[in-house]
Amino acid sequence: MSGCDTMHGRRNRKIEEELQSTLDNGGNVWVIGDVHGHADTLTALIESLNLDSIDRVVLLGDLVDRGPKSCEVIRIAREDSQIFCVLGNHEEMMLKQFDVDNIGTMTAQQAGWYYIGGRATAQSYIDDFTGTSGDFSRFDLKQRAAKDLAWLDALPHHIVLDDFRLVHAGYSPWDGDLDLQSTDTLMWVRGEFHNAITPVDENRTVIFGHSTMPGFGLKQSEIWESEVELLNSRPAAIGIDSCCYGGDEPQLTAFNLLTGDVVKQQVIISKDLAKH
């Protein structure tokens, strides 16, 4: 598996061509912020978008951890041909630290990941592979986890379109060629990107998650727009992580690349959530 901090970010030109073609033909491309295991909320948000067959959805990473149904979120993203994803830092940690043979036990390998939400992800796999009689199928879980991890490990780190860059965390304004920036930067950067005094890409708005609205001093019902503008007066960057796992107004945000519309879904508190 990758997750190697020294590598530069991976792109998928086929995905980029499909998304750009969607926009060129008048279709909607909805970009959704960090889901963090809230499968019911993701499903409700996507249903509210009333997608046509031409429309597409991009998840900005951090599909997993903290919420109760990470296993189901990955299943939704894998199986729906209208959904694409970029890799987030929580998937990177899952790739490095998910120990299927010791699932449910906080081993030394899994300790760091468990601390920041991985425990809920591990439990979601246990829940999905525990029958109504309480029988736990470790064999089936290992097969499913192997497929999920292989799928995650092949995801692009960023998506580049004519007018937008879609990435989990952002870019460094100091590290030169954006296509050669490290995976560590693309999945973890914060302040230096948020505080950039010039656009990191003078032709494209960067749409990102990772950093929550309260971190910008905003309400969760808002989105963050950089005060720095492109030559066409569009914001240089837009942040859409509404912090669906906590705060006073936990919600999930979708941003439409074609129209600029924003749709939000309040987090659905399921019975499962009470168990985690």
Where are these regions (language model features)?
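N-terminal active-site segment of His-dependent metallophosphoesterases
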Residues: 2-74
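Active-site neighborhood of divalent metal-dependent phosphoester bond hydrolases
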Residues: 70-156, 195
